[in-house]
Amino acid sequence: MTQGKRKHPCDLKNPSKRAPPATCNKPNGAILCGDFCLHEGYNIGKCVMRRTGKACICSQCEGW
């Protein structure tokens, strides 16, 4: 029996939302990402590496 990749508990209740493209590529990208997520009603936002570059991901959970 194979198990799929487990989702983070925060992802189950609170689907992540992406900020506008290239937000995290700017010098102050982390700040812009956090501000965008707060404005959208999330608790936290951070830049993560993806295959296509950095992406801003919003979450309701701290420390994810």
UniProtKB/Swiss-Prot annotation:
One of its GO terms (biological process) is defense response to fungus. It comes from the Eukaryota. Residues 1-21 are annotated as: Disordered. The keyword Disulfide bond applies. Keywords: Antimicrobial, Disulfide bond, Fungicide, Plant defense. Disulfide bonds join C10-C61, C24-C47, C33-C56, C37-C58. Belongs to the DEFL family. This is Defensin-like protein 41. It comes from Arabidopsis thaliana (Mouse-ear cress).
